[in-house]
């Protein structure tokens, strides 16, 4: 197989969110397969020396906090999977149903807290920052649990459940209302057989900008949509400068994020995967640590004996 070729930022900025790589890059993301190491001692040697650490996180790290992933067997809301509802077409066809789905997800987060994995990442960022070392999190998650745990250097490439975007004026705003609008109160039950609320569009969340009143949508990246070029430029810079990369709780099947860690590995930077199972990318990385992230990450990111702690 051909080695992975670094995908230039001008290409990455044009990529869209999806479950398969764009045709133009499918032949660029293959690496020679090798068995990854599970030696924590060896990983810790790299960790002790790293000055710029990138952590790429996915749904697995939040699943340990009880956040529904809508992936795999049982990953349904009513009779739909996320990819059935998280699309521009679904919103255009039935905005009430899509808003019920996202209202349910927002309300669920009210009872969820960061787990040991989130906390280990945030603590590591704070500790290493005092040593002049950089830790940045690139997350595909939209639940804000990294932020809640205290992570500051955070790139939320798929947006946030708690931001809205007006379909008329384009204004993006934080929104932590519960419920987000009166008509959604008590709606969004996930059980199969639950009937759609069929809320009139004028009663769905509306823009509060003066003179607008347009329909709001969740400020998240839906399947088939382009990712924000500005955020992806930041991602590209972080990947280009990191000297250690961790891939945490991600299935490595959603693009373009699935390309990020292989890009880094292609230039010889050690990459460590932390997951409850192997993924299509496992053999492209130097390390693989199998198990719950809340168990493996605290050990991996703990203060090293060679660190100078102020």
Curated annotation (Swiss-Prot):
The keyword Nucleus applies. Binds 1 zinc ion per subunit. InterPro entries: DHS-like_NAD/FAD-binding_dom, NAD-dep_sirtuin_deacylases, Sirtuin, Sirtuin_cat_small_dom_sf, Sirtuin_class_III, Ssirtuin_cat_dom. One of its GO terms (biological process) is protein desuccinylation. Belongs to the sirtuin family. Class III subfamily. Interacts with CPS1. Interacts with PCCA. Monomer. Homodimer. Forms homodimers upon suramin binding. This is NAD-dependent protein deacylase sirtuin-5, mitochondrial. The lineage of its organism: Eukaryota, Metazoa, Chordata, Craniata, Vertebrata.
